[in-house]
Amino acid sequence: MLKGAFHNHTTASDGTATLSQMAEAAQNLGWEFLGIADHSQILQIASGLSPDDLVTQSEEVRALNENWSDKGVDFRLFHGNECDILSDGSLDYTDAERNILDHVVGSVHQLPTWVKRDEDENTEALINAIENPSFTILGHPTGRILGGRDGFAVDLHAVLRRMGELNAEGELKVVEINASPYRLDLDWRYCRYAKEQGVPISINP
């Protein structure tokens, strides 16, 4: 049974429902939690959140959680963000700005640089990203759009191995299956390998 999902966008960026509306819908589905992950500031085309917006959203999440707790409602919002992975593998926002988050979904959106580079360069950049202590979930790992564009070249076996190594050291690194019918990314062929490496899979809409 699906208990929740961690990669969800609200009207604060490019989603179609408010935070409260999404929380209500999740509760109606019987979910135990909902993770918010609006776009980060660099992705202005999708109304990415400024650092001040991030703080405001964090306060809204905290207020909703406190209200449910006071009423005995067994439901929790997690405050995350879909932080862009930049071309060198660094993450959008400063470390301090990301530290207020419950989770970070790291994703590549600035594709022109990535599609021009070879597999080794892209793999190194992704590994740099996942090694950041604030990084939690690798979002739509190849950036592909089914029927639209191929993903960028990357050695996902190497990336998943490194995630597994970090998990063995006590960190939590998760790979996403983005279940949008336009993405289905992570490709199913890597799911067993992720499990073998000790990398949890997060299924998100």
Predicted features by range, described:
Residues 3-15, 36-41, 137-143:
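Histidine-centered catalytic micro-motifs
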Residues 1-2, 44-170:
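Extended substrate/RNA-proximal surfaces in nucleic-acid metabolism proteins
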Residues 30, 170-172, 198:
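Glycine-centered short loops/turns at secondary-structure junctions
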Residues 20-35, 59-68:
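Alpha-helical scaffold segments that flank or form the walls of functional sites
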Residues 180, 199-205:
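Short acidic/histidine-rich active-site segments
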Residues 7, 26, 38, 77, ...:
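Divalent metal-coordination and catalytic microenvironments
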Residues 5-21, 111-117:
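Active-site mouth loops of central-metabolism enzymes
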